[in-house]
């Protein structure tokens, strides 16, 4: 093989389809838009959800619920994620963000009981599940709601 014999991989270089260049191309005259009608016009297309004037599905279905403006979203941390800290560490929300366990604090941190804890830690968080609090205390650590 020589440099002038190099060719791109099959299918990696797709040729752009040029429309309106004669009937023989298969996309001449109307350029693949069919005859007349709204979708044949320039800029002419229907918005998403439009059903030709029929009452659209999203308006036929009843409204449900509301958005609680006071909703709090907690960053979730499981017990097995706390194993990355050394024995005797005081785990705070700031430390969890700094070490990359959670991206951001959100409205607070909630510790859940998935996995097992192998270290003795003092954990400070906004909320604890019952199983998480029990597991932390069982290892001789402490949990504190802040």
Curated annotation (Swiss-Prot):
Keywords tagged on the record = Ribonucleoprotein, Ribosomal protein, RNA-binding, rRNA-binding
Question: A Pfam family name for this chain?
Answer: Ribosomal_L27A
Q: Does the keyword Endoplasmic reticulum apply?
A: no
For bias type Basic and acidic residues, the affected ranges are 1-13
One biological process GO term for this chain? translation
Offer an example of a GO molecular function term for this protein: rRNA binding
User: Quick one: where's region Disordered?
Assistant: 1-56
Recorded GO cellular component terms are: cytosolic large ribosomal subunit
- What are the Gly residues biased-composition ranges? 23-35
What InterPro entries has UniProt attached to this entry? Ribosomal_uL15, Ribosomal_uL15/eL18, Ribosomal_uL15/eL18_sf, Ribosomal_uL15_bac-type, Ribosomal_uL15_CS
Q: Does the keyword Ribonucleoprotein apply?
A: yes
Question: What role does it play?
Answer: Binds to the 23S rRNA.
What's the subunit arrangement here? Part of the 50S ribosomal subunit.
Give the family, as the similarity comment puts it: Belongs to the universal ribosomal protein uL15 family.
Q: What is this protein called?
A: Large ribosomal subunit protein uL15
Organism of derivation: Staphylococcus saprophyticus subsp. saprophyticus (strain ATCC 15305 / DSM 20229 / NCIMB 8711 / NCTC 7292 / S-41)
Its gene is rplO
């Amino acid at each position: 093989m020589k440099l002038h014999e190099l060719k791109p991989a099959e299918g990696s270089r797709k040729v752009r389809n040029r429309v309106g260049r004669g009937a023989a191309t298969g996309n001449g005259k109307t350029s693949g838009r069919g005859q007349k009608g709204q979708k044949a016009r320039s800029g002419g297309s229907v918005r998403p959800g439009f059903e030709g004037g029929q009452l659209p599905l999203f308006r036929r279905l009843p409204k449900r619920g509301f958005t609680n403006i006071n909703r709090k979203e907690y960053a979730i941390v499981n017990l097995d994620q706390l194993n990355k800290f050394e024995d005797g560490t005081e785990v705070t929300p700031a430390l969890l963000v700094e070490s990359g366990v959670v991206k951001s604090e959100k409205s607070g941190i909630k510790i859940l009981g998935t996995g097992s804890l192998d270290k003795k830690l003092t954990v400070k968080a906004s909320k604890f599940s019952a199983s998480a609090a029990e597991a932390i205390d069982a290892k001789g650590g402490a949990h504190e709601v802040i």
